[in-house]
Design a protein with these regions (language model features):
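Short, compositionally biased
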Residues: 20-157, 177-178, 184-186, 192, ...
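Sec-dependent N-terminal signal peptides
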Residues: 1-26
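Functional-site microenvironments in short loops/helix caps that host divalent-cation chemistry
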Residues: 149-158, 162-260
Length: 260
């Protein structure tokens, strides 16, 4: 994935799930075109008698049962649509400093404008729905972590959704401008929950529900936990209106060509 800056928790979150977008925009079909009548061959058409044209009647109001077109995505999801460049050049202009005073090659303070490389294949048309928030998608709650890939896939399926592919996640984060950060080209730790120190768990952490029910596991989880409540960073939002894609918890994605 190209989108930069997820929090370094080492505790993978469940997911932001994806789904299919509606394709019907609700617009009526175009009216059929009618060809003008022609005179029969060999005869001259007689002019029509002069008749006063009636005053056009006002268009009838729409029936009370008429409903607006359905939204492209279900409630809680956002439409992600556009052309996705599959080979992008994102050149770092300024590295952040590491703890030892040197340059941190994994973190870039400022990028130049992204470019779709000359060798890139044709941009891929993308159109899909994506959860606006990390699971469970409730503002004020913390995203769920300590979840396996198979559990994440199962939970998405239980809601009639699926895991996003890696390409979908990247495009939802970058948009057509191929932004290295959802909010632009310069890293800002105040806009997203990023750049917290990584704390290594001193013991094996159980799956989420089991860990919270185990006092020793819950205490260790609380010690290394760097999550913040969903919606805490309103500026950490992608061009499509999806939050925390490069902040807070890491998310699982689907790579159909690989085994999980």
């Amino acid at each position: 994935m190209r989108c930069h800056g997820p929090i370094l928790l080492g505790l993978l979150g469940l997911a932001v799930c994806c789904g299919c977008a509606a394709t019907d925009d609700g617009s009526p079909p175009p009216a059929a075109k009618t060809a003008p009548a022609k005179a029969k061959k060999g005869r001259r058409a007689k002019p029509a008698p002069a008749v006063a044209e009636p005053t056009p009647a006002a268009a009838p109001p729409p029936p009370a049962s008429a409903e607006p077109a359905a939204p492209a995505c279900p409630e809680g999801m956002a439409l992600v649509e556009g052309d996705h460049c599959r080979a992008v050049e994102q050149r770092c202009l300024e590295q952040l400093s590491a703890a030892d005073g040197g340059a941190d090659e994994n973190r870039c303070a400022k990028f130049e404008a992204s470019k779709c490389t000359s060798t890139a294949p044709e941009p891929r048309k993308m159109r899909f729905c994506m959860d606006r928030y990390e699971y469970p998608g409730k503002v004020g709650e913390k995203p769920m972590t300590l979840v396996s890939w198979t559990d994440a896939e199962r939970v998405c399926a239980s809601h009639g959704k699926r895991l996003c592919t890696e390409s979908e996640f990247t495009f939802a984060c970058e948009g057509e401008k191929m932004l290295p950060y959802t909010y632009g080209y310069e890293r800002d730790a105040k806009k997203c929950n990023i750049d917290k120190p990584y704390l290594t768990p001193q013991k094996h952490l159980l799956p989420y529900d089991q860990c919270l029910a185990n006092p020793a596991c819950a205490a260790e989880y609380a010690r290394v936990d760097g999550r913040e409540p969903i919606g805490s960073h309103p500026e950490c939002v992608s061009p499509f209106g999806i939050y925390d894609l490069n902040g807070n918890a890491n998310e699982w994605v689907s790579q159909p060509w690989k085994n999980p």
